[in-house]
Amino acid sequence: MTNIRKSHPLAKIINHSFIDLPAPSNISAWWNFGSLLGVCLALQIITGLFLAMHYTADTTTAFSSVTHICRDVNYGWLIRYAHANGASMFFIFLYFHIGRGIYYGSYTFMETWNIGVILLFAVMATAFMGYVLPWGQMSFWGATVITNLLSAIPYIGTSLVEWIWGGFSVDKATLTRFFAFHFILPFIITAMVAIHLLFLHETGSNNPSGLTSDSDKIPFHPYYTIKDILGLLFMLLALMMLILFSPDLLGDPDNYTPANPLNTPPHIKPEWYFLFAYAILRSIPNKLGGVLALVFSILILMLFPSLHMSKQRSMSFRPLSQCLLWILVANLIILTWIGGQPVEYPFISIGQMASISYFCIILILMPATSLMENKMLKW
């Protein structure tokens, strides 16, 4: 008799995806982030569902309803902070996951990579709309500033912004629709994750050497299930320490002031995970130019397969490319720092230099270095 795991139509899908899946024998802890992102997504959907049971998407009561969740709902404070800090963990893992993909050349799986970039855009949109929901000062002004960027689009810009707002300013209609979109998007993301995995399982996982591993595969379970559970324990430890010891560490104090359209906060800034893109946006004095730079700073990820000039897939044996990648990481940290600073000297010029460096490293220096490494190896 055949094992039900291998014969039942539903169990068969799970078996081929998580149990009998052939996996390379040498994948490192950098391959843990995919499963951790899956756990984060599940955590966000579950905590978000419980928050939605008590939240009201109305300008007069939204702020009070969040306060009510934290004060009066059983473990409401825990659910709220798990959701807010869970989003931060989500982005930390996303950036690690993308960084690993760049380092080890995983972007050569074109379909998987491009769906991943679309997923990144969807997660960023979801996080932005979620930040608006508590209806604090930074929620309101963040929504106003970021949606206003669309007015830079020639001819249709102003009409488009008013259409998104549902009026002539960010108001009740905007909050209601943002809540609706914030609720539905994670389910769309879940469906896209399934497609992401579908394409990944067509090719199989990459590995640190960048070489094909068909001759040396091991079953996913128990080897990588145990490894993923260990990663999960570390994640939960970090997340619980963040929630229980300093839940507001990554938030903005201005968001504890109810939204007031008549009073602008001294410095409008998004959550920490958008600061690098915000710095790139602000570094260009022209509005349309800034918006294009902002979009292209993420969209540039889709160019990685075309910009790959090396004869080797992974950076494991390419020290010059490795140095350049770590310079890019340092550059992104500088951009994140600049995004949180006021628009004044010397931050403006530092931001402009870091923005130029960002695009130069990816578009010029990395391909040039790859070609140079090929020459050094006489390929």
Curated annotation (Swiss-Prot):
Cysteines joined through disulfide linkages: none
TM annotation in the entry: 33-53, 77-98, 113-133, 178-198, 226-246, 288-308, 320-340, 347-367
Keyword Iron in record: yes
Keyword set, alphabetical order: Electron transport, Heme, Iron, Membrane, Metal-binding, Mitochondrion, Mitochondrion inner membrane, Respiratory chain, Transmembrane, Transmembrane helix, Transport, Ubiquinone
InterPro entries: Cyt_b/b6_C, Cyt_b/b6_C_sf, Cyt_b/b6_N, Cytb/b6-like_sf, Cytochrome_b, Cytochrome_b_C_euk/bac, Cytochrome_b_N_euk/bac, Di-haem_cyt_TM
Gene Ontology MF, one: ubiquinol-cytochrome-c reductase activity
Function in brief: Component of the ubiquinol-cytochrome c reductase complex (complex III or cytochrome b-c1 complex) that is part of the mitochondrial respiratory chain. The b-c1 complex mediates electron transfer from ubiquinol to cytochrome c. Contributes to the generation of a proton gradient across the mitochondrial membrane that is then used for ATP synthesis.
Protein name: Cytochrome b
